[in-house]
Amino acid sequence: MLPPRTDPPPAQHSDDAVRLTDDDAASARLSAAQLGYLQDPFASLLYRPPMPQPGAFAPQAVGRARKPPLINVGTHHRTWGIDRLVDRFLQRGGKQVVSLGAGSDTRFWRLMSRATPPDLARYVEIDFPHLTSPKAQRIARHRKLYQYLGPSSTAMPPPGHPYTVSKGGTQLSSPLYTLLPLDLRPSPSEPASSISAILSHHVLPQLDPRLPTLFLAECLFPYMSPEDSREIIKWFGETFCSCMGVVYEMVGLDDSFGNVMKRNLAVRNLSIPGSIFSTPESQAGRFTSPMLQGGKFDSAGAKTLWQIREEDVGPEELQRISKLEILDEIEELRLVLEHYVIAWGTKGECMSSISL
């Protein structure tokens, strides 16, 4: 939740830098889970903190990736807000979820391990092959993970391994869940519109266009051009008559704090072409832009994490997490939380009026 650290060495390639952003998010989730901000028994199964370099000072055990209170609180609010939107999608009869740039995310397992799991038809996670490969290995290694890969209506986990691994270990498929290795970006010589062909060729076969579908994009679009991210939103809006999208983004990168964030990202060989959507209003407007044509969503909204803290989390939950760690700098917390936003768009009658 803070501007990304500058202590990791600069990535040699921008894709390596993207991988490091997943490390940041996964280690933040692990920290929040270990300290009691989140209930997530799967975070430690899908992510392991990197071993310290030989001779490096390691004041904490490798298995405990503790983050500062500011990051833990931000991770809680991010998870709280997105979870509420996902739950409301499911309560309206949502059947399919596509997580773009899923990385080490645990949401599928958190959903399916509930006492009453949702009646999902398909859950698809997409990321670069060098990120899906270790995730597929971890899923295959832990029964606590692969036991949930069967049909969602199955009361008991199926015997054996309910999945297949393909594409050199980078893809894992089951009747309910697919981990798909895919680079959504067109080549430099291709137009942004070619993203639609990529999605139609690789992703659509995993889904049923007749079913209400949600796509999630957490900290993905900032690293894509506005044209590319618009094509993704447009494709979902055109392909599914009943659809919802949820994005988690950085905003306000043109102020002094935002400039610090950009400089720290630049040190790590990361640019943010999507930063032109600098306000919650402009983030929501991506779903209803006339440029989407037939893929335009019916309604949209957005809230900063600070607004979610003030309006949605609730006093009992805020009191609970306030007892976990001492956090004195509320103004600093507000500054950070106002630079992150959750935006959503809905299309179709059964998805109408979903919001935070």
UniProtKB/Swiss-Prot annotation:
Q: Name one GO molecular function term.
A: protein C-terminal leucine carboxyl O-methyltransferase activity
Q: Where does S-adenosyl-L-methionine bind?
A: R78, G101, D127, D183, L184, E218
Instruction: Supply the Pfam families for this chain.
Output: LCM
Give the EC number(s) under which this enzyme is classified: 2.1.1.233
The enzyme's main class, written as a single word, is: transferase
Q: Which GO terms describe its biological process?
A: methylation
Q: Which SUPFAM superfamilies match?
A: S-adenosyl-L-methionine-dependent methyltransferases (SSF53335)
Q: Does the keyword Iron-sulfur apply?
A: no
Is Transferase a UniProt keyword of this protein? yes
Q: Which reaction does it catalyse?
A: [phosphatase 2A protein]-C-terminal L-leucine + S-adenosyl-L-methionine = [phosphatase 2A protein]-C-terminal L-leucine methyl ester + S-adenosyl-L-homocysteine
Q: Which domain of life is it from?
A: Eukaryota
Keyword annotations: Methyltransferase, S-adenosyl-L-methionine, Transferase
Physiological role: Methylates the carboxyl group of the C-terminal leucine residue of protein phosphatase 2A catalytic subunits to form alpha-leucine ester residues.
Assigned protein family: Belongs to the methyltransferase superfamily. LCMT family.
The name on file for this protein is Leucine carboxyl methyltransferase 1
Gene (name only): PPM1
